[in-house]
A protein has these predicted regions:
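Charged helix-capping and loop-helix junction motifs
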Residues: 56-63, 130-139, 163-172
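Catalytic cores of alpha/beta
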Residues: 60-96, 103-105, 168-203
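Hydrophobic faces of well-ordered beta-strands that scaffold small-molecule active sites
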Residues: 2-8, 44-47, 71-75, 94-96, ...
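Glycine-rich, proline-tolerant flexible connector loops at the mouths of alpha/beta enzymes
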Residues: 43-57, 153-162
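Conserved anion-binding
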Residues: 8-23, 84-159
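Short catalytic helix/loop segments, enriched in acidic residues and glycine
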Residues: 19-38
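Flexible "arm" and connector segments at domain edges
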Residues: 130-138, 202-204, 208-386, 390-428
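C-terminal helical cap(s) of enzyme catalytic domains, especially alpha/beta-barrels
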Residues: 102-115, 193-222
Length: 428
């Protein structure tokens, strides 16, 4: 797997030579644009260098990025308060370095934690790579393997120098742990990317992709198994409601177009040509992420669909009707809100328009429906009233320009947040 790195310093995406903040090789102002492009290729790795160096933070920017993209976040996480804050912002996982102790890590689910093994000459260093710990990499990995799901290994003396990474050291770490290993620092060539993938390690790429020495698209292409279907790969296409909407095929060129443009491109086996979804129908696909399976021979496109995905006029998906769920309802409410607020709406007194424009109406309905849910006694009554509460909750979110995805990220953050130490939990 590939994790494009976004290192933040002073609100910019930067790359430092040797981790030295006074030797900045790359500085990009448009962090959001970089993130959108990178996110199509893999889950982002966001590193707050200011926090790591103890000279401020980039929390507002990180919150914005985590609201839009899947990301793991690290840099300066030296307190439970900061860890909790990042999880609530939507970080999928936390990268912990300086505070990677059993006591600190045990407060969180292991599947939400990555331990940073930053090494100089085999010794683990912390505090922004400025302090030696006396611990060796393999010893630290053995000590902490039960408290995390991944290790992020960086030979810091190779970081940003474009001189290649330490494949032998990474192979030793992969062999020594059952945890997933992500390699960073000095990766500069496609053979290295492929070698790491073959040994079971992922790549966190920084300097090489910012300077153009490596292309993220080339990296993805190189890891895939193109030999099973005459140079083609099957693609499962999934919309923002997580409904599978179609199955298609790509060759290298179609995949490259997709990754470069963010539009769904495919290869037609019957017509023997490339095609872009929506080129005649207007029912386009915005590709948010391209992911590949464990065998590297099947792709998943996560998309935002405009109109129908299927060529049959009566079907939304090539597999049938659009699935109804809370996101479907949310989309309908957002559409109704836009219509209700249009200046030329004909039905100014409609109930829908009132819900989105009349102060206090949604809040009053929520209070009423919550009370009825509390009083509901039979299974049927409980389901009925719960549906009303959900409807008006989604209406309130839509009225304020908020989404169900934001609520889900909040719940996901709470799920991964700190647990009380065992000694303080008391008897249940």
């Amino acid at each position: 797997m590939i994790h494009p790195s976004i290192d933040l310093l002073g609100g910019k995406a930067v790359q430092l030579r040797g981790g030295n903040p006074d030797d900045c090789v790359v500085a990009i102002d448009d962090v959001q644009g970089v993130a959108a492009q990178f996110a199509r290729h893999g889950e982002l790795a966001i590193i707050d260098l200011d926090a790591a160096l103890g000279r401020g933070d980039n929390l507002a920017l990180i919150a914005s990025l985590c609201a839009q993209f899947d990301a793991r976040v690290g840099g300066g996480i030296r307190s439970h308060e900061r860890a909790d804050t990042l999880l609530r912002m939507g970080a999928k996982k936390l990268i912990i370095g300086t505070c990677a102790t059993p006591d600190f890590l045990s407060r969180y689910p292991a599947d939400r934690l990555i331990v940073a093994l930053d090494a100089k000459g085999g010794e683990v260093v912390d505090h922004g790579w400025t302090r030696g710990t006396g611990a060796q990499v393999l010893d630290r990995a053995q000590q902490l393997s039960a408290y995390c799901s991944e290790f992020l290994y960086t030979p810091v003396d190779r970081e940003g120098l474009m001189g290649g990474t330490d494949l032998e050291a990474i192979a030793r770490l992969v062999a020594a742990t059952d945890n997933r290993v992500v390699a960073a620092g000095g990766i500069t060539s496609l053979p290295e990317v492929v070698a790491l993938d073959r040994m079971g390690a992922s790549c966190q790429l920084g300097m090489a992709i910012y300077t153009g020495a490596l292309s993220l698209t080339d990296c993805v292409m190189a890891m895939l198994d193109w030999g099973k279907s005459d140079g083609l790969l099957p693609v499962v296409v999934q919309d923002s409601n997580e409904q599978v909407v179609m199955h298609a095929w790509v060759d290298r060129e179609a995949l490259a177009f997709t990754l470069a443009t963010g539009n769904g491109h495919y290869f037609s086996r019957s017509r023997e040509r490339h095609w872009r979804k929506g080129e005649t129908s207007g029912h386009t696909q915005r590709v948010l992420a391209v992911r590949y399976d464990c065998d590297r021979d099947t792709l998943l496109y996560r998309i935002e669909q405009t109109g129908r995905a299927c060529h049959i006029p009566t079907q939304y998906s090539c597999f049938g009707d659009q699935t109804f769920n809370l996101r479907t309802l949310e989309a309908a409410l957002q559409s109704r809100r836009a219509e209700a607020l249009a200046a030329d709406t004909e039905d100014a007194g409609s109930y829908t328009r009132r819900l989105f424009t009349e102060p206090g109406l949604v809040e009053a309905k929520l209070k009423e429906e919550v009370g009825e849910l509390i009083d509901a006694a039979t299974p049927r009554e409980i389901v009925w009233e719960a549906a009303d509460v959900l409807f008006f909750t989604l209406t309130k979110l839509a009225r304020h320009g908020l989404t169900l995805a934001q609520v889900e990220k909040e719940l996901h953050g709470r799920h991964g947040r700190r647990r009380a130490p065992a000694s303080s939990q008391g008897d249940a």
